[in-house]
Structure formats: C-alpha cells, structure tokens
C-alpha cells in the first residue's frame, strides 16, 4: 500500500510565516553586528543589498573581522582538512574491531568517502560555513548528491552554505533541527528549465516565462519530517523527510519529493536557554568591536585636526585674502604683529591625548582576539617551541572551546559523514563487506574524528600509556622484571594504533600474530636443539683420545689377571 501524502500549501506557508516572525528579532540584531564584524555576510539578512555596493560604511577598524576569519580558517582547516583524513569508521561492537578483514573494509569505505568529500566543494563551502558559525553563532549547510555522469554511477556530493537571511527552522523535542524553510529568488526563465515546474505554474506565470524570463519570483523550499509514509516503498513520496517547493506569489506547489536523511547540517556555537538560534564569539566580541570602531573614528577625526589644524588669524594682520597653498605668499602688516609674522597665523592646538587612544585601542584589540580564541587556536611563530609546550597549548585550547567542538561534531561533521556514507552505500559505491559472525550482522558503525584537535582530546590515554612505560622502565632497572607481567602488551599496541589513527592494514590479525609467534617458538626450539647437539659433539670430540687409549688399558688389566691366575 502506498501512502498518499497530501500537502496543504496554505498551512505550510502559514507555518513558514510564523517561523520567520520568530526569527525576525535575531535578524535585526545580527544585521547590526555584521555591519561591524563582517559586512559581506549581511546581504539578505534584512532585505537584499545591491550588488557591488559599499558594505564597510560603519567599519573603521578591521580587527574584529580579522580575528574572526582567523578562527574560522583554523576551524575549517583543522576539522575538515582536505590534506589529512579527519574521520575514521569503527564498529560499535568491540569484538568486530579484532577482525582485521572487517576493519580493512571499513577503512576502504572511509577512504572512498573521504575522497568523495575532497572531490566535492566541501572545503570551499565549509570555510563559508565556519565564518557564519563564528560571527553569527549559527550556520546551515545543504548536502546533496550531485548528478551522475552515467546512469548507475555515484555522482558525488554537492554542498551549499546558506546565508543567515535565507532560512528559518524548527527543532524537535531533543533540540535537533528537523524542519527548515529556505527562501530564494529565481527567474521565470530558470524555473522553466526545471522539469515539471512550468506545467504546474498558473497561466499568468507561464506567460511571463515567454514574455519576461528575467523577472524574479520567490520560492520557498521546506524540508520536514514525515509522520505517515510507507517504509516498504522506496519512492520520493515515502521517505522519512518530505520536500516541497512552493511559489509564494501564487501559492502553488511546484514540486514534491523526499530525502532519506535530513539534508541540512545546522550548527549552533552555543544556545541560550529558550532559544533555538545560536550565539557565538561574535556576540561576545561585538561590544568591544563597536567601542573600537567608535574610538578609531574619533582618533581619525583628532588626527585630521592635528595634521590640518584649525588656524587662528590675527584680525586685519594679513593684507588681502590669506592663502594656505604650497609656495603661497601672504602679505603681513608688520605693525599689527609687532614685526613677528608668526603671530599673524597660528594653529589651534586641540590638546588631544593620542597615547591614551593608542593604549585603549591595543587593549580592545587584545580583548577582541581573546573573544575569538586567537590566543589558543593560532600557534605563534616560535621556532624553539618544544613538543611539550605545543601539547600544552592544545590542552588549553581543548579546555577553552571543548564543548563547542562537541556541538560541531554532533551537528555538523557527524551529520555530513553519516549522510555521505548512506548515500554512497545506496549507490553501490562501496566494496562488498567481508563475512562476519551472524550475531554482529546489522551492528552500528561509529565515527571517530581524526583531526589534530580530536586527537588532542583523546591524548590523555596516550599520555597515560607513556607514563606507564616510564614507570615500567624504572622497575626493570631496579630488577623487578615481574612488573611487566601486569600489562597486556598486545592490547596496549592496538589501543595506541587506534588513538593515533594508524591505518588498519598495518595491524596484524591476532591469528596471524599467533602463527608468527608459533613459528618463532618452533625456530627457537630448533635452534636450541642444534646448540645442544653442537655442545654434545664438542664433548664427544674432547673424549676421543681417552676412548682411543681404552683398549690398551683393558689389555693390561687382562694380562694382570692372567698372571695372577698363573701364580696361584
């Protein structure tokens, strides 16, 4: 049975208007912030800005924008690196982790998934996404499958970061975004190229396709969780998440489809109680950025007065009109100035305290960089920095924004990897899995993030192992050789391989390890037997002269017994 999905366009648009109204206060404040922090992100937050127009009217100092871009670039390059694999797939069942064939299959799947990410526009869109997350505290990224070049092939991924003014959303009972409205403008000509749209447009709109193809109209795309659908059907109308495009002007449903997973990764830096939109470092830095810009504006005004000051001119001391042009000549009445021509024109000193302004600006800039965590994420250029000092900086960084990384992992990275894995699995882009015990069929696959920051968060176990080895070395030096029996060296090696992200093909199968050890034991036993035989042969060689003399001695003894018998 196919479930008939009926959509009430009017109800959807009313829900969209309510959601947009709840977001309006955020839009107003975010627009005010972005004019000082990152003006280029302010487009479409509250109306569209004309293309090519000036955006830095209120910005007199770029310290806030510079600090935010450094944080965003650091997060993007560290968490989603195009040059270093930033995630690993592992089975949730620990028993499966001891099966090298299965682990190699998961590693192959992870490598193919990572290659698909690198072949897409993820790195480019992730950089924009982290900018929104840093300045605004909220970002949304659309994750779709790209069109395949040939039928039956996997087409790859396509990502798009949404501007803050393009969308509004709703949360489920667990605080995760599960419904998103995206508003965008398109032309009638572009809409006519989308299959099925022009047939559903009213007659007036179809006429504009022919007569005014460049005219734009608004479309709302909503993705929502379906409450009623047939899980046995695989068509678009029976997927967990519904999708529909609505022409708002005519209230016409242009297209209806679905997704197997929610296609948007909506991330919040942090949330205030009762709010669904995030707040980030930009909110914390904004008061200082606003003060810094105002102080920089006043400093420029004071500087202009110092460079080109107001002049005090003695009344009627200059004969004719005064000129301030280079190489200009002014006739001075000597009697009026007492033959001191400098008294005729004098600058008006403002008495501005420029040093106070410089000190205040430096203090504000330091606070702004602290708000954007530049002191923790950006490693200073220090060639003599030791590994211990670098590890210490990573630990401080982890403590300062560790909770934020947790939100990024859950709301962005895990959603991207999970959806990407599911899309490639459905498309047959992975090799067939190896056989596993029946009780583990259908086990869950977990994601382990492998970026430098993620490894820093797991480095405590590695440090504990290193400290144990130092202690064990000391015990061995003291003659306590039995201390080594307390630890499982094989399990320790596997733990270190997992913590450091060692490729699975470098870790041997337990059966293979047992075979190698058995062969070594047999070889050692054979070697021991050869050594014993050699020692025996050496002993036999030393006894040969004595054996050679044995017959002669025996003959002498026999003669002695014979003579004794004759005498009796």
What are these regions (language model features)?
Residues 33-61, 130-131, 204-238, 330-350:
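An N-terminal domain-start capping segment
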Residues 37-38, 53, 98-146, 277-313, ...:
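Long, contiguous amphipathic alpha-helices that act as assembly "spine/axial" helices in icosahedral shell
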Residues 3, 17, 21, 145-329:
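Structured, contiguous alpha/beta core segments that scaffold functional sites
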Residues 32-39, 69-80, 286-302, 491-498, ...:
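Short, hydrophobic/amphipathic alpha-helical patches that form generic packing surfaces
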Residues 104-105, 112, 263, 339-340, ...:
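Short, flexible segments with low predicted structural confidence
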Residues 1-211:
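Extended, helix-rich architectural segments
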Residues 30, 75-76, 125-134, 219, ...:
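Generic hydrophobic, helix-prone segments enriched in Leu/Val/Ile
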Residues 1-29, 42, 48, 312-568:
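C-terminal anchoring/interaction modules
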């Amino acid at each position: 049975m196919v479930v008939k999905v009926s959509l009430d366009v009017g109800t959807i648009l009313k829900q969209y208007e309510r959601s947009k109204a709840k977001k309006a206060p955020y839009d107003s404040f975010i627009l005010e912030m972005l004019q000082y922090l990152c003006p280029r992100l302010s487009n479409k937050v509250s109306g569209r800005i004309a293309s090519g127009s000036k955006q830095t009217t209120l910005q007199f100092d770029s310290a806030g924008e510079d600090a935010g871009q450094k944080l965003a670039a650091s997060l993007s390059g560290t968490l989603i690196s195009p040059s270093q694999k930033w995630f690993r797939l592992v089975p949730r069942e620990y028993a499966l982790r001891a099966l090298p064939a299965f682990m190699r299959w998961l590693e192959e799947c992870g490598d193919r998934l990572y290659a698909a990410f690198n072949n897409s526009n993820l790195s480019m869109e992730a950089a924009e996404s982290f900018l929104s997350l840093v300045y605004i505290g909220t970002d949304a990224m659309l994750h779709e499958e790209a069109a395949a070049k040939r039928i039956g092939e996997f087409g790859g991924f396509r990502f798009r970061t949404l501007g803050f003014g393009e969308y509004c959303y709703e949360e489920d009972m667990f605080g995760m975004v599960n419904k998103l409205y995206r508003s965008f403008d398109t032309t009638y000509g572009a809409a006519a190229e989308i299959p099925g749209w022009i047939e559903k447009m009213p007659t007036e709109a179809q006429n504009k396709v022919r007569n005014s193809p460049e005219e734009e109209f608004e479309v709302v795309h909503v993705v929502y969780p379906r409450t009623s659908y047939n899980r046995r059907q695989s068509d678009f109308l029976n997927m967990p998440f519904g999708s529909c495009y609505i022409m708002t002007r005519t209230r016409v449903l242009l297209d209806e489809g679905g997704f197997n997973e929610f296609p948007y990764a909506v991330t919040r830096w942090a949330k205030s109680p009762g709010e669904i939109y995030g707040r980030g470092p930009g909110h914390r830095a904004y008061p200082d950025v606003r003060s810094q810009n105002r102080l920089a504006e006043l400093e420029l005004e004071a500087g202009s007065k110092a460079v080109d000051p107001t002049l005090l001119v003695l009344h009627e001391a200059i004969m004719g009109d005064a000129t301030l042009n280079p190489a200009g000549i002014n006739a001075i009445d000597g009697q009026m100035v007492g033959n001191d021509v400098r008294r005729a024109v004098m600058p008006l000193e403002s008495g501005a305290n420029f040093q106070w302004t410089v000190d205040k600006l430096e203090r504000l800039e330091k606070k702004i960089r602290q708000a954007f965590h530049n002191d923790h994420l950006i490693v200073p250029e220090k060639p003599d920095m030791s590994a211990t000092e670098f590890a210490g900086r990573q630990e401080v960084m982890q403590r300062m924004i560790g909770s934020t990384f947790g939100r990024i992992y859950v709301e962005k990275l895990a959603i991207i990897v999970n959806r990407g894995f599911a899309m490639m699995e459905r498309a047959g882009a992975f090799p067939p899995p190896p056989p596993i015990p029946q009780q583990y069929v259908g086990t869950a696959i977990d994601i382990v993030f492998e970026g430098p920051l993620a490894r820093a968060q797991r480095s405590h176990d590695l440090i504990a192992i290193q400290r144990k080895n130092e202690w064990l070395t000391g015990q061995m030096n003291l003659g306590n050789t039995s201390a080594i029996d307390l630890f499982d060296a094989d399990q320790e090696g596997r733990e270190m391989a997992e913590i450091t992200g060692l490729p699975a093909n470098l870790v041997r199968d337990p059966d293979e390890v047992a075979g190698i050890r058995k062969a070594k034991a047999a070889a050692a036993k054979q070697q021991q037997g050869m050594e014993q035989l050699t020692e025996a042969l050496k002993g036999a060689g030393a006894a040969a002269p004595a054996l050679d003399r044995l017959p002669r001695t025996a003959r002498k003894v026999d003669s002695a017994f014979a003579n004794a018998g004759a005498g009796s």
